[in-house]
Each structure stands twice: as structure tokens, then as C-alpha cells.
């Protein structure tokens, strides 16, 4: 997936300063969320942030650009013959990410994470050691810092129609420990925290949940979690605690398949 961003930087002209334009773009897809395949299209991304670094320190204020028509653009004025790091973060402004420091992005204390909510999707890029020699116009592609975890059950059809009360309407998900901080400057996740939420199941075909989880590029975050199946009133039907060491890798979709007492998984690229 790609991203583009835009904002004017009111810097007084100075000797050696040249003008630059950086664009980031996100393809927009369908707005419905009827199936797991509909998640991750980037359609809820509405802002892009840019922090410029020089010699490892922030250079000027963080800038914000509105994503409109899949694109946003930053108009800059930087001193030539210098190297800069460009750090981008693009998200849905309603998600509640704490982004004052792009080297320590977390979900804010007032934000409650839940699965099956695409507003928690996000993109980033760190373009390091970019030497500004003259005016330029660049387009950069952003990537997700997450792996996407999908959970599906395959035994709903085994429940007879006259036992509809045994078909889950909601699920409670308990992750034992997940990364909770992301450094967009280094591209590394860190920290750990238990995560719990309750959400309506995605649909009646057995697709249950979709989660965005901080994950590394090469090796995988190993997720342990329990899923409790609930009826519409929140009463427990059954539970599955057998989700152990599920590998979550950045920019990949992992499908965890649940039966009454079993689970399996498969992983495949989704970007």
C-alpha cells in the first residue's frame, strides 16, 4: 500500500534554502466491513504526520497533512547540502494514537483498542540520510508497522438451526502479551502489555475477528490468546485457550482457524 502527504512550512527564506515537495498516497477501497478481506484497504486513513530529523534530533515542528483523495503533500523549505531523516506516520485521527513523539508511538490511555475496527490501521516510513542538493519533488511509499491477525471458526455449520443460541454473536479476546510501542524512526516495536476486548463477530459465516498487531519485519511476534464465544446477551457459550505462539509478521496476514477445541494457522502476504 502507498501513501502521500501535504502541508506548508512557514520558514523564512535563508541562504542555501530550496523548496521541496514530498507526496505520499493511500489507495482507497470499499467502505463496507462485511468480511475479513475488506479490512486493510487504508480507506480510513485521514491524516499524515511528518517529523524531520537532522543529526538525530528533531528539525523544526512536527507537520500534519490531511489525506484527501488518497493523497497529501508536504511543501518544505530545507537548507541544501544537508542530510535529513524524514519520518512519516499516517493513521485515522479517531484511533487515539499518541504521536507527539514519532519515536514512541502508543495507543493513548483514553483509547480503547478493539478488534474488527479498521480505524486502528496505520502506515509509516523513515527515509534516512536524504541529502538535499536542490529543489525536488518526491513520492514515497509507506508501509504498515503491523501484522494482521484474522480468526475464523469452521464449525458453525455443525450447529443445528434449532440451537441458534449456541452460535456466537460476540467474542471476548484475551492476548497474554503484545508489543505496545512503536518507533517510526527505527522501525522497531517494543514494550509489552496484556490486551483484552469484546467485539461483535465479523459475520455469520465464521469469520470472527481482525486485529492489527505491532510486528517485526524478519522474525515474528508470537501471540498467545484466549477466545471466549458469547451469545448476543454476553453469556458465555464456550472458550478456546489453544491459540499458542501464533506468528504475526509485519505486512502479512495470519489466519488462525478455530474449531471447538482445536486451532491451526496459516500466514500469507496482504500488502
Region annotations inferred by a language model:
Residues 11-20:
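Short, low-complexity, disordered segments immediately C-terminal to signal peptides
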Residues 39-100, 160-252:
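Tryptophan-paired
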Residues 4-5:
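C-terminal motif of bacterial Sec signal peptides marking the signal peptidase cleavage site
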Residues 20-148, 157:
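Short, low-hydrophobicity acidic/polar segments
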Residues 260-267:
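Conserved small/polar residues in nucleotide/adenosyl-binding loops
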Residues 133-176, 180:
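A surface/extracellular/periplasmic glyco- and lipid-processing/surface-interacting theme
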Residues 256-258:
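Acidic, proline/serine/threonine- and glycine-rich low-complexity intrinsically disordered segments
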